[in-house]
Amino acid sequence: MGFNIAMLCDFFYPQLGGVEFHIYHLSQKLIDLGHSVVIITHAYKDRVGVRHLTNGLKVYHVPFFVIFRETTFPTVFSTFPIIRNILLREQIQIVHSHGSASTFAHEGILHANTMGLRTVFTDHSLYGFNNLTSIWVNKLLTFTLTNIDRVICVSNTCKENMIVRTELSPDIISVIPNAVVSEDFKPRDPTGGTKRKQSRDKIVIVVIGRLFPNKGSDLLTRIIPKVCSSHEDVEFIVAGDGPKFIDFQQMIESHRLQKRVQLLGSVPHEKVRDVLCQGDIYLHASLTEAFGTILVEAASCNLLIVTTQVGGIPEVLPNEMTVYAEQTSVSDLVQATNKAINIIRSKALDTSSFHDSVSKMYDWMDVAKRTVEIYTNISSTSSADDKDWMKMVANLYKRDGIWAKHLYLLCGIVEYMLFFLLEWLYPRDEIDLAPKWPKKTVSNETKEARET
């Protein structure tokens, strides 16, 4: 018997990113395993209401005020009526939220706990402790996860970061990495349709990502001119958009690199593979990274990886696929890039086996099965007392911080008052149940038979 699961996050299609693809691919594989999945996110321009995606995946686009980078305005309580209605209509058993910076994720967990549902949270990011934004997010996460059933982190570094930020027990935190659809990131076939635009005499370095300071954009604008001045046969392809885009334009003009640096701007995800296949090396200068899915995608296209060692990056790929910078600095990244260029130029490393290795290491079906194990565990071992409202309110009061714990307590009490009010105004037995999408479980044997 499958679970009825709701994924909650501010970030989903049509916006593209690592969290969005994680939610989509995980949901698709959960459906293949026989579970029912709906996604609850905010409206994106004309995407309002209910949308049905491949395999019967239902998406609720809730109209809500967006403040910054597709994050909705935090109100704690105002999303309760609509989220409660959806959870009851879809007969949800498990609420799975994603993203520390997502308002829908935080409020969804709070409302689900109040309704007595099982809750899971996946963290995709690393946060520090030395600026106002990080402190605010950490305090909010501490409140949200006080009564969580299980937390999933995408790397061991992310898990350690989560423990320090929220003081949760390590026993309820699991590590499940991201994955990649290796079929979508096949290396270039010289005899096929994807042909390299650059001359084979050139070494092409690819950079793909959001052009933000935390993604190393300031470092890249200083690294690229240095590498170009040292190697006449090196060219760059930079794909992505963000507030640092103009800095890249200025860098190209000031160093007269118009013929050696292509600035593509935002690239649709279905075109990312085509961009990667134009290169020999992938350069990743991120200042913070919990996992780094793009590294797996680049390696799947047989690119040699040059990267920093921040966060969970060292856990992602084997050493033979990567050249690490000793420090997150311009000089060390230039040195690592020069080393990778010499490896490619001398053909000291055969990268043609990278794709097969990555396809064996990362698979979304494996991620889904491990996630289902967590769902099964919290459903079978947890008791009804865990969701007793008096116990959960008491847990909020036990948190550290003389002001914080009183604020948590006040929010918890108001939440339960609102819960009882909604139960009286809109009784759950008067809410129509949504019909389930007809589905058939896809077994591994069936998939193998189809492939053969």
UniProtKB/Swiss-Prot annotation:
GO biological process, one term: GPI anchor biosynthetic process
Keywords: Endoplasmic reticulum, Glycosyltransferase, GPI-anchor biosynthesis, Membrane, Transferase, Transmembrane, Transmembrane helix
Effect of substituting residue 301 to A: Reduces the transferase reaction 5-fold
Topology in membrane: Single-pass membrane protein
Notes on activation and inhibition: Inhibited by Ras, probably via the interaction between RAS2 and ERI1.
Known pathway: Glycolipid biosynthesis; glycosylphosphatidylinositol-anchor biosynthesis
Catalyses which reaction(s): a 1,2-diacyl-sn-glycero-3-phospho-(1D-myo-inositol) + UDP-N-acetyl-alpha-D-glucosamine = a 6-(N-acetyl-alpha-D-glucosaminyl)-1-(1,2-diacyl-sn-glycero-3-phospho)-1D-myo-inositol + UDP + H(+)
Subcellular localization, as worded in the UniProt entry: Endoplasmic reticulum membrane
Transmembrane regions: 407-427
EC number: 2.4.1.198
Gene3D superfamilies: Glycogen Phosphorylase B (3.40.50.2000)
Coarse class of the protein's main subcellular location: endoplasmic reticulum
InterPro entries noted in UniProt: Glyco_trans_1 (IPR001296), PIG-A/GPI3 (IPR039507), PIGA_GPI_anchor_biosynthesis (IPR013234)
Domain of life from the UniProt record: Eukaryota
GO CC annotation terms, alphabetical: cytosol; endoplasmic reticulum; endoplasmic reticulum membrane; glycosylphosphatidylinositol-N-acetylglucosaminyltransferase (GPI-GnT) complex
A GO MF label: phosphatidylinositol N-acetylglucosaminyltransferase activity
Quaternary organization: Component of the phosphatidylinositol N-acetylglucosaminyltransferase (GPI-GlcNAc transferase) complex composed of at least GPI1, GPI2, GPI3, GPI15, GPI19 and ERI1.
Miscellaneous field: Present with 1480 molecules/cell in log phase SD medium.
Family membership noted in the UniProt record: Belongs to the glycosyltransferase group 1 family. Glycosyltransferase 4 subfamily.
Known role: Catalytic subunit in the complex catalyzing the transfer of N-acetylglucosamine from UDP-N-acetylglucosamine to phosphatidylinositol, the first step of GPI biosynthesis.
Protein name, per record: Phosphatidylinositol N-acetylglucosaminyltransferase GPI3 subunit
Gene giving rise to this polypeptide: SPT14
